[in-house]
């Protein structure tokens, strides 16, 4: 069994984002250094997906400031067998509203990819809010991305992107890795990109009822995936998940790495290490 760990390397940004922040948005990356130090030699390889998008350029004048702010750290991790990848949020500045909002097909995507790709080979992605669409996966495939691990099997949810509310839908995708169809991102098809779903945990009966109620309040009566629950690596796990997938994938964020998050994350890593045949891999090594 392959185990894939990813970190969405997000900064601290205000919401809504209407003007350039005065504070250092990347100060939260100090948490990553504390996590790495606490883990020591026991840290398995992780895929660090550094955020590069229009909101980052707006806030720092550069798409690649997340890499440059901790270049020595990222290079050190890469030298230890970790992988660097790309994370982004599909938002563009809406001049009419004077703030960032959701943009399903942003003009800046290729430029952000090129900027971060000047520092390392960009092979892996995770999307902001775990968002997926036919248009997005086709564009990632065209950019040469070989692994995306954003899918949440059975998940239907709603997120705020600036002042816009968007629906996240992975209700029909499989739990095992698949090459998406160019005209249906939730079904196997013709894209070269491999989608590796995040491993779901088992939801409680009460949790399933609450989730169905949430869906109904948002206009969806779908019962798909009610038994699935997403847990981050840094959250308490009551039990290990059970999945037929040959790849178990989990994620976390720098902001999750307070003392409690670091302790839980390392505890969960140790639990995964006890699984028979467990092999921790980076995203590219899934292939």
How does the language model describe each region?
Residues 1-75, 80, 121, 261, ...:
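Active-site beta->alpha N-cap acidic-glycine motif
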Residues 12-15, 55-59, 92-96, 132-136, ...:
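Short catalytic/ligand-binding loop motif for oxyanion handling, primarily in non-cytosolic enzymes
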Residues 18-23, 57-61, 98-99, 120-122, ...:
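Surface-exposed cleft-lining segments at the edges of enzyme active sites
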Residues 22-35, 63-71, 105-111, 174-178, ...:
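Well-ordered, non-membrane alpha-helical segments in soluble/globular domains
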Residues 42-133, 151, 200, 249-252, ...:
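Metal-dependent polysaccharide deacetylase catalytic core of the NodB/CE4 family, i.e.
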Residues 76, 117, 134-146, 267-274:
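Short, surface-exposed basic-aromatic patches at helix termini and helix-loop junctions that form
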Residues 127-244:
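Active-site-adjacent pocket scaffolds in enzyme catalytic domains
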Residues 221-287:
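C-terminal domain-boundary segment and adjacent tail
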């Amino acid at each position: 069994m392959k185990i894939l760990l990813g970190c969405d390397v997000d900064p601290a940004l205000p919401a809504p984002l209407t003007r350039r922040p005065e504070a250092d948005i990347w100060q939260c990356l100090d948490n990553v250094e504390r996590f790495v130090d606490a883990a020591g030699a026991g840290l398995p390889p992780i895929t660090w997906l550094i955020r590069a998008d229009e909101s980052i350029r707006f806030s720092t004048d550069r798409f690649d400031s997340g890499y440059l702010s901790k270049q020595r750290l990222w290079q050190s991790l890469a030298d230890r067998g970790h992988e660097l990848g790309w994370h982004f949020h599909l938002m563009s500045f809406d001049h009419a509203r004077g703030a960032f909002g959701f943009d399903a097909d942003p003009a800046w995507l290729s430029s952000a990819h090129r900027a971060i790709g000047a520092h390392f080979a960009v092979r892996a992605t995770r999307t902001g809010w775990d968002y997926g669409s036919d248009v997005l996966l086709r564009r990632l495939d065209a950019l040469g991305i070989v692994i995306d691990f954003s899918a949440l099997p059975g998940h239907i949810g709603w997120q705020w992107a600036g002042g816009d509310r968007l629906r996240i839908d992975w209700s029909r995708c499989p739990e095992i890795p698949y090459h998406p169809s160019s005209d249906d991102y939730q079904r196997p098809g013709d894209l070269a990109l491999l989608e590796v779903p995040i491993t779901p945990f088992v939801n409680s009966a009460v949790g399933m009822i609450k989730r169905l109620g949430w869906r109904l309040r948002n206009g969806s009566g779908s019962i798909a995936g009610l038994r699935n629950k997403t847990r981050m690596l840094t959250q308490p796990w009551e039990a290990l998940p059970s999945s037929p997938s040959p790849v178990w994938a989990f994620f976390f964020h720098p902001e999750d790495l307070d003392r409690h998050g670091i302790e839980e994350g390392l505890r969960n890593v140790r639990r995964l290490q006890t699984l028979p045949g467990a092999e921790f891999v980076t995203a590219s090594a899934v292939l």
